[in-house]
Swiss-Prot record:
Protein species of origin: Leishmania infantum
Function of the molecule: Lyase that catalyzes the C1-decarboxylation of 4-hydroxy-3-methoxy-5-(all-trans-polyprenyl)benzoic acid into 2-methoxy-6-(all-trans-polyprenyl)phenol during ubiquinone biosynthesis.
Entry's EC annotation: 4.1.1.130
Protein's UniProt name: Ubiquinone biosynthesis protein COQ4 homolog, mitochondrial
Keyword field: Lyase, Membrane, Metal-binding, Mitochondrion, Mitochondrion inner membrane, Ubiquinone biosynthesis, Zinc
Cofactor(s) needed by this chain: Zn(2+)
Length: 187
């Protein structure tokens, strides 16, 4: 993950400045217009009774840069829920984990899929193929040397809070899962 961040200009800037998403970002987001990315973030956090400060600190990683990368991975998880349009059902959480695995290569996503699979009904399990396709289409890629879909750790989410949700979707190139599923049903 560090190498992917170092290979990207925005990623290098994030590693240099090491922004941390704190409770003040959530408080700021609560006052934003309903059409903004930040408002959706605040609504998600409040609905689930989450606070940015509620995340356990990264431990057992001696290298400060690698520790920050893991901190960013944890903090960006909530932003991934917002940009992908995924809630917190087991099925949606597994879709997010597949998406995160496609972006980071961390095996946690696949392990979560294996751990969550027994809790899914047959119809829900059948959806996993669609979620895999969606995550694959939203994996980091570039066109003409420019990132079409940046690795999500390289997105300056903390600077996107006041922007319109649709503007953030366009910036990231990520198709939210509900939109992907709607298009699939039309075909």
């Amino acid at each position: 993950m560090k190498n992917c961040m170092m290979a990207d200009q925005r990623g290098r800037s994030i590693l240099k400045h090491q922004p941390v998403v704190g409770d003040e970002a959530l408080e700021f987001s609560r006052g934003l217009a309903p059409s903004t990315f930040g408002f959706r973030y605040a609504a998600y956090m409040d609905r689930n009774h989450f606070l940015p400060s509620g995340r356990t600190a990264v431990k057992h990683i001696a290298d400060p840069t690698l520790a920050y990368v893991m901190t960013r991975y944890r903090q960006c998880h909530d932003f991934v829920h917002i940009i992908t349009g995924c809630g917190r059902s087991i099925e949606e959480e597994l879709a997010v984990k597949i998406f995160e695995w496609k972006h980071t290569g961390l095996p946690l996503g696949l392990l979560s899929l294996l751990g969550g699979a027994p809790r899914l009904a047959a119809a829900q399990w059948a959806h996993m193929r669609l979620y895999w396709e969606w995550a694959s289409r939203n994996a980091p890629c570039s066109r003409h040397g420019e990132p079409a879909v940046p690795m999500y750790l390289n997105v300056p989410w903390e600077d996107m809070l006041a922007k319109e949700y649709d503007e953030v979707v366009a910036y990231t190139g990520i198709t939210p899962l509900p939109q992907f599923l709607e298009k699939r049903q039309q075909h």
